[in-house]
């Protein structure tokens, strides 16, 4: 899957002799889900290395700062990255990242935090990999309904209604 994403980003197919330098910046590497995702990503890149595609990856932690993430993208591009994977700190503020990448013709794969549609239309080398937020919300709602039906203890005041439900997401 990783090689397909990288191929999709380029104007040409990646050949076995190409070197792929991937720059990754995450909003917060202390996030458990992101940590696991990065482990899997690195395993996939190691698999590509074993199969003749030379890959290098540099991972940066923005630690919740959009300014830091913007600077990291510049550093990664200046270091020679030919593809960026960005987990945005602020999904509504990717313009500086997009502008720098576009200026240097480095495609961006946004992951897990989807930029707004208007930003995704800024350039034809922007991609998003992740869940459909609306679908995730619907699934959370369906799971909550099923749990309530299966466990009457959830209705604490026994009036047949749930007064308060918290669903978390972006």
Residue ranges and their predicted role:
Residues 1-7:
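Sec-dependent bacterial lipoprotein signal peptides
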Residues 8-170:
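A residue-level marker of the well-folded mature domains of exported/periplasmic proteins
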